[in-house]
Structure formats: structure tokens, C-alpha cells
A protein has these predicted regions:
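Feature of Fe-S/electron-transfer and energy-metabolism proteins
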Residues: 1-575
């Protein structure tokens, strides 16, 4: 496409507007696509949108200038972003930024004269345990140093991931169960397996190179059809990444490089011997640990929600189905009524994991009782995780997106909702890709969309990307952003459960809350409520970053002390 051709640009915009049905709520998505194609928002494109969608040009400019992800001036071929969040700041992100500025000869917000590089900063990229972080065209590089900056920028090459496979379509709960039994032996055999962490944190340490090296090495030994190899979501122990776990003994190797892969395959996969030099060594006791669950970082955790992250390929819906995925949805559709679902969630004691800890069942009950003029209600997932040092939501969306999606569908059944949105930070490209892929797979499989599992229940979900405004994580600002308006909070004298998105009853929960729902429906309220304290049930996920020995993502029972988290799991404060 000739990007300087105004006619071609106008045609591109017209196609985008038509594809999005000229809906005001899709304005941000349209702007993102234009910027993806042209590296900025040309003035002509904004004028075309205003004409085609019959929106005042001032409103278009209002959205384009409010969100920091958008640019009205051309950007370079490669976008270099440096995290300046608290966790990266204490690890000298300022020095890294200065080095990039020296190397490129530009400052933040500027573009090199040859249009090769643009330099940007961001408050937090959610890979805090691997800081300081630099991102080039969406690829993360962690533990940056001046030497690494120069090496990466000199040799940078763009990488593209292969498109994931889909699944068959299920017309009933029985059909889903039949398929589950057929894929279990292939994806959950209990035999030899190799799990390579491919979450953002480990990707920053080049784990994708480790994964590819492992694939080639297994093939060279004729083991590619005998060993289950998975690129998984975040294992949590980000500071020691890239991580590789070899099953069924679950031997944990840390700081693995592509050069280590040959030894891991020859010694551990083939002969069952441990590669001592790659084991985790506790800095306090000097002890080395072979098995993942024995490592102090993991030993005191209770990974009810995060556990599957270490074994699932998030791009494969059959991995999720093989381990019980969407069984809770089938149960909610055919064995429970909406009131029963809400009652189960209430007896489990689930509270919101993203804000004030409001009882989830009470929230759902209010939204179910609320009247809608046309019967339309919404459920929303708030994944606009902007707090510095926080990356809990990112890891869940990247590593186990179907659990979040399944929770949302169950919530929609309980509330009587017809549409859902996942609002994700634009600074989380892997999370956006992961949840978008999960939605497409679920639709293809008959688990989302019209007549889910032949039940007659209809529900669809869309992804709405944030555009760099921290305030858009606030509930009413988030809804304004989805509607295509400037993401500013409104007065809260009217609850969003009564009058929310598009002035319809709306239920908003965060990523972690939704991920708890399938667990409750599958295992029952009593089992779930047996974890935690009398008033706070279940577990809570925390990002453990900054000046601490073991940084990463932890999941612990409610009621645990901060001292236990910092010292027993985190290994204490260095020095």
C-alpha cells in the first residue's frame, strides 16, 4: 500500500469504518489500526473518519490527543520504548534511557532523521521482575545494560509468531466432553514433557529463542513426537528466567540459554540426569533445589489460579479443554440456574480482586435485578492494569486467557448479559494477542457467540484496547473509553450496575476475579471457601518486585502475612 497516496489512505479508512459498522464504540480500535498501518494518525484519516461516521472532527481529535498511545506526527519504522516505572527506576532505567538517547541521537518523543527509530517512555510495562525493560516493536528485552542496548539496537530484527491452531465446534456438553477425552492423552499424558516459560518477563530474557532451540534439539534426537513441548504462560519466578521445567519430575532449570538446550535434552530428557549448574541455588542457605515445588519461592504459595500457567500453551484451546476447561461453563448452562450460580459464588465468599474487595455475588445480584429498556446488559473485564509494578492481570491474560473468558461467560449467564468487553492496556501487546486469539477460538468452537453449546444462550465478547491514559482504569472512565469518548470519570451517584455502558446495566470485574469463577463452579463453594480466612476466602495474586531477592508473581492464601511473602517467598531484602 502506498502510504503517501491520499486516495489509498481514504480507501483504507473507509474499509475500516465499514468493517466496524461505523460504531462510535469502535473509534479507538479504528485509530489503532490506522496507526498500526501508517505509524501515526494522518490528518486526512481523521477527517475521513469524521465524515464517514458523522462524528464532529473535534471529538475525533479529542480522543486522538487524550490517549498517549496515539501520535499525530509520523513515527519511525521501529518503536523503542523504555519503562520508567518504579521497579525499573530503582534498577537504573534512567541510565538505560540516557544510553539509548546517546546511541540514537534523539530524546524521548523524538524520531531519528532517517525515520528508522522513534523513542518513547511509559510508566509501566508490567515486566517489573525483569527490569529495566526496553521494548522494540512489541518485543521485550529485560535486565538491560548499556552494552545490551547497543547490541540489540545494532542487530535488531523483527520477529513474527505463527498463527495458532483452532478447535472443532461443539454443539452440546456431551460433544465437549467427548472431545476432552480424545485430547487428554495427547496433551496431558503424564509422560516426558518440557515446559518453557514464554510470558513477557521470560521473553525479555530471550525465552522464545530457548523454545525454538528446544524444538530443533528434540527433533534432531527423534523425540519431537515423544516429548510434549510447550511454550507456556508465566511461571512466576520472573527474576530467574528464562525458566524450563522438565516433567514428569518437574525439574526446574533457571537462566536457561539456547546454548544450554543440548545439554538439557541429552542429560535430563534422554538419560534422566540433572544438570546441576542450571538448578536454582538459594542465596541464603546455599542449597540447590531440583524440583519446582521444593524451591522456597514456590513452596509456600498456593497456586490455585496461576498453576495452569506453567503447563498450558495459551494459544491452544485444546490444552485448556484437556485439563477441564469449559466444564464449568457446561455445568452453569445445563445444571444450574442464574440464581444458583450467584448463590454458589456468594457462598464461596469471592470478593473483587481489583478494587475495594466488594462481594462479587452482591454485585452480580444488583446487575441481574436491574431493568434494561431493551434487555441488553453488559459484563466487562477490567484489564487496564496501570499501577507501577503490577503485572498480575497481564500474566493471567497471557498465560490462561480461556479461564478469564470462561468466567465472563458464566457471569453473563448469571446476570443475563448479552455482550462483554475486555478492556486491555495497549502496552500489553502479548496479552491483547492472547485474549483476542482465545475469543476467536471459543467462537469457532461454539463456546462463545450464538447458541453456546446448543443451550440457546447467546453472548459475545470484544477486546477494547486502552490507549495510554492511566485514568481509564477507573470504572466510568473505562466505559467512556469503550464508547469511543475521552476516558474521564463521571459522578457515581448512579451505580453502573443500573446505568453503565451505553446507559445499560453493566457489571465490571477485574481479570483475577473472573479467573476465579470457573474454579468455584467446578469445585464448589465449600472447597473454595476452605482456603483463606473467615472473611477473606481463596487466594490473592501479588507482583513481588523492587529491592527483593526473588522477584516475580506469587499467589498466596488470604491471611498470609507480609513478612511471609517478603522473606519466606521473596527471600528477603538484599544486603
Amino acid at each position: 500500500m502506498g502510504k503517501s497516496d491520499i486516495k489509498t489512505l481514504s480507501e483504507f479508512v473507509a474499509d475500516l469504518v465499514e468493517l466496524n459498522n461505523s460504531e462510535r464504540s469502535r473509534l479507538s480500535a479504528i485509530l489503532h489500526e490506522i496507526q498500526r498501518e501508517y505509524n501515526y494518525l494522518p490528518e486526512q484519516a481523521l477527517r475521513d473518519i469524521a465524515t464517514l461516521m458523522e462524528i464532529p472532527i473535534t471529538d475525533i481529535y479529542g480522543v486522538a490527543t487524550f490517549y498517549t498511545s496515539f501520535s499525530l506526527v509520523p513515527k519511525g519504522l521501529h518503536i523503542v520504548t523504555v519503562c520508567m516505572g518504579t521497579a525499573c527506576h530503582v534498577r537504573n532505567s534512567r541510565g538505560i534511557l540516557d544510553e539509548i538517547c546517546r546511541f540514537l541521537g534523539i530524546g524521548p518523543g523524538e524520531t531519528t532523521p532517517d525515520m528508522a527509530f522513534s523513542l518513547e517512555t511509559v510508566n509501566c510495562l508490567g515486566a517489573c521482575a525483569m527490569g529495566p525493560i526496553m521494548v522494540v516493536d512489541g518485543k521485550y528485552f529485560g535486565e538491560m545494560s548499556s552494552t545490551k542496548v547497543r547490541r540489540i539496537l545494532k542487530k535488531y530484527q523483527k520477529e513474527e509468531a505463527a498463527a495458532p491452531a483452532g478447535a472443532k465446534r461443539f454443539s452440546s456438553a456431551a460433544d465437549l466432553e467427548k472431545h476432552r477425552e480424545s485430547v487428554k492423552p495427547l496433551r496431558y499424558s503424564g509422560g516426558t514433557s518440557v515446559y518453557v516459560c514464554a510470558g513477557t518477563g521470560c521473553q525479555a530474557g530471550s525465552s522464545l529463542d530457548v523454545l525454538e532451540a528446544m524444538r530443533l534439539e528434540l527433533k534432531s534426537h527423534g523425540l519431537d513426537d515423544k516429548v510434549l513441548l510447550r511454550g507456556t504462560g508465566c511461571h512466576g519466578f520472573c527474576e530467574r528466567g528464562p525458566l524450563v521445567v522438565v516433567g514428569p519430575e518437574n525439574i526446574l532449570y533457571q537462566k536457561v540459554t539456547p546454548e544450554d538446550v543440548g545439554e538439557v535434552v541429552a542429560e535430563t530428557v534422554k538419560d534422566g540426569r540433572v544438570v546441576e549448574r542450571l538448578l536454582y541455588e538459594d542465596p541464603t542457605s546455599g542449597l540447590k533445589f531440583e524440583h519446582k515445588d521444593e524451591v522456597p519461592f514456590y513452596a509456600k504459595q498456593k497456586r490455585m489460579i496461576l498453576g495452569p500457567n506453567g503447563v498450558l500453551d495459551p494459544a491452544e484451546i485444546d490444552d485448556y479443554i484437556a485439563r477441564g476447561g469449559y466444564a464449568a461453563l457446561a455445568k452453569a448452562l445445563f445444571d444450574m440456574d442464574p440464581e444458583g450460580i450467584i448463590d454458589e459464588v456468594g457462598r464461596a465468599g469471592l470478593r473483587g480482586r481489583g478494587g475495594g474487595g466488594f462481594p462479587t455475588a452482591d454485585k452480580w445480584k444488583s446487575c441481574r435485578k436491574a431493568r434494561s429498556v431493551d434487555g441488553v446488559k453488559y459484563v466487562l473485564c477490567n484489564a487496564d492494569e496501570g499501577d507501577p509494578g503490577a503485572f498480575m492481570d497481564r500474566c493471567l491474560l497471557e498465560g490462561n486467557p480461556h479461564s478469564v473468558l470462561e468466567g465472563m461467560i458464566i457471569g453473563a449467564i448469571a446476570i443475563g448479559a448479552t455482550h462483554g468487553y475486555v478492556y486491555v492496556r495497549n502496552e500489553y501487546p502479548l496479552a491483547v494477542k492472547s485474549i483476542s486469539n482465545a475469543i476467536a477460538q471459543a467462537e469457532e468452537a461454539g463456546l462463545l457467540g450464538m447458541d453456546i453449546l446448543g443451550s440457546g444462550f447467546d453472548f459475545d465478547v470484544s477486546v477494547s484496547r486502552g490507549s495510554g491514559a492511566f485514568v481509564s482504569g477507573e470504572s466510568t472512565a473505562l466505559m467512556a473509553s469503550i464508547e469511543g469518548r475521552v476516558g474521564e470519570p463521571r459522578e457515581k451517584y448512579i451505580h453502573t450496575a443500573v446505568r453503565g455502558l451505553y446507559v445499560r446495566p453493566t457489571n465490571l470485574n477485574n481479570v483475577e476475579t473472573w479467573a476465579n469463577v470457573p474454579l468455584i463452579i467446578n469445585e464448589g463453594a465449600e472447597q473454595y471457601a476452605s482456603v483463606g480466612t473467615e472473611n477473606s476466602k481463596g487466594t490473592k495474586i501479588f507482583s513481588l518486585v523492587g529491592k527483593i531477592t526473588n522477584t516475580g508473581l506469587v499467589e498466596v492464601p488470604m491471611g498470609i502475612t507480609l513478612r511471609e511473602i517478603v522473606y519466606d517467598i521473596g527471600g528477603g531484602i538484599p544486603g
